[in-house]
Amino acid sequence: MVEADRPGKLFIGGLNTETNEKALEAVFGKYGRIVEVLLMKDRETNKSRGFAFVTFESPADAKDAARDMNGKSLDGKAIKVEQATKPSFESGRRGPPPPPRSRGPPRGLRGGRGGSGGTRGPPSRGGHMDDGGYSMNFNMSSSRGPLPVKRGPPPRSGGPPPKRSAPSGPVRSSSGMGGRAPVSRGRDSYGGPPRREPLPSRRDVYLSPRDDGYSTKDSYSSRDYPSSRDTRDYAPPPRDYTYRDYGHSSSRDDYPSRGYSDRDGYGRDRDYSDHPSGGSYRDSYESYGNSRSAPPTRGPPPSYGGSSRYDDYSSSRDGYGGSRDSYSSSRSDLYSSGRDRVGRQDRGLPPSMERGYPPPRDSYSSSSRGAPRGGGRGGSRSDRGGGRSRY
């Protein structure tokens, strides 16, 4: 990369800032006829920058001067004299670093890719998903490395983020949600990519590649209920997805204002802080739930899976939020109870809900599902508000 500049041109470095062109010419003139002495100066201060270029008429003279003067002292400073290289050499020199730099990003990408890939691979199946999920999560974390930071903030729970990072592992393991929380988002991204895209972008980026929904879900599902859910999730998940996707849309549609506005408006805050995952999901799920409840069979398991997922979410969320944890749990619980009541009363879906969802989940699912609908807007919001104010 380094090309010699024109023959006879020498680079003189390490000069005393007091050394001027005349001094250089006097010193190097004894080796032969000098065509040009170029002392590099600072544009603003006009002071010597400590290096110069001396061009000899004869390349042989330049070689002699370089051989004799290199390392010699001039005006009290040892100078470096060598054949000048083209300026590109500088960029060239710098160039190599860039490759590393560029390489770095690729690495990052690779990491991301790996993460997604990992997730993706695993996502293919539940079991894998778990691993995948984990790996995913971890990959995510690793790929997300930077993200985590972002992630931390997003939760806006301050405390939670750290918790999340730590929990993410555990949480992940427990719910597989830690990583997944993001996933939930991923899902959101799925469902409401718009909403989350910002956030998701990071995670989703990973997630999406990951098939966030799937992997995550899978992860969730697999993790959450590895076996039962895995399969179920798997089968349903797609459905869920579909439903969810539609559900989301519907839920969004149902709660467009809410889904979007809340989510969007708060968008991410809420998503993060509140139930974005939970609420939104819940809502979405609810919507699904409802839509799903129509197909209870599917609905319940998925929803139920979903609810658990939600729960997971909540946990993850919680893990995520940490505060949210308590919050979500409390929230879910509170909500669940409140919501359940509200939702159920509002919805008058108690049976299906209860039936559809096991009680605990019920609370979650129903809460998530129930409330959102009836109380969804008001309830969930208030809940949200409450949750928020509470925390």
UniProtKB/Swiss-Prot annotation:
Intrachain S-S bonds: none
Cross-link entry Glycyl lysine isopeptide (Lys-Gly) (interchain with G-Cter in SUMO2), positions: K22, K80, K86
Localisation per UniProt entry: Nucleus
Any Pfam family hit: RRM_1
Compositionally biased spans, kind Pro residues: 151-164
InterPro entries per UniProt: Nucleotide-bd_a/b_plait_sf, RBD_domain_sf, RBM, RBM1CTR, RRM_dom, RRM_dom_euk
Composition skew (Gly residues), residue ranges: 109-120
Biased composition (Basic and acidic residues): 61-80, 194-215, 241-274, 338-347, 380-391
Modified residue annotations for N-acetylvaline: V2
PTM summary: O-glycosylated.
GO biological process per UniProt: cellular response to interleukin-1; membrane protein ectodomain proteolysis; mRNA processing; negative regulation of mRNA splicing, via spliceosome; positive regulation of mRNA splicing, via spliceosome; positive regulation of transcription by RNA polymerase II; protein homooligomerization; regulation of alternative mRNA splicing, via spliceosome
Annotated positions of the Phosphoserine modification: S88, S91, S165, S174, S261, S328, S329, S330, S332, S352
Post-translational modification N6-acetyllysine, affected residues: K30
Domain RRM: 8-86
Region (Necessary for RNA-binding): 333-391
Sequence positions bearing N-acetylmethionine: M1
Sites bearing Omega-N-methylarginine, chain numbering: R125, R144, R164, R172
UniProt keyword Ribonucleoprotein present: yes
Molecular function terms, GO-annotated: chromatin binding; identical protein binding; mRNA binding; protein domain specific binding; RNA binding; RNA polymerase II cis-regulatory region sequence-specific DNA binding
CC per GO annotation: catalytic step 2 spliceosome; euchromatin; extracellular exosome; nucleus; supraspliceosomal complex
Positions of the UniProt region annotated as Necessary for the association to nascent RNAPII transcripts and nuclear localization: 186-236
Function: RNA-binding protein that plays several role in the regulation of pre- and post-transcriptional processes. Implicated in tissue-specific regulation of gene transcription and alternative splicing of several pre-mRNAs. Binds to and stimulates transcription from the tumor suppressor TXNIP gene promoter; may thus be involved in tumor suppression. When associated with SAFB, binds to and stimulates transcription from the SREBF1 promoter. Associates with nascent mRNAs transcribed by RNA polymerase II. Component of the supraspliceosome complex that regulates pre-mRNA alternative splice site selection.
Subunit structure: Homomultimer. Found in the supraspliceosome complex. Identified in the spliceosome C complex. Forms a complex with ILF2, ILF3, YLPM1, KHDRBS1, NCOA5 and PPP1CA. Interacts with CLK2, KHDRBS2, KHDRBS3, SAFB/SAFB1, TRA2B and YTHDC1. Interacts with ERAP1; the interaction is RNA-independent. Interacts with PPIA/CYPA.
Entry remark concerning the domains of this protein: The RRM domain is necessary for RNA-binding, but not for splice site selection, indicating that its splicing activity does not require direct binding to RNA.
Protein name: RNA-binding motif protein, X chromosome
Originating species: Macaca fascicularis (Crab-eating macaque)
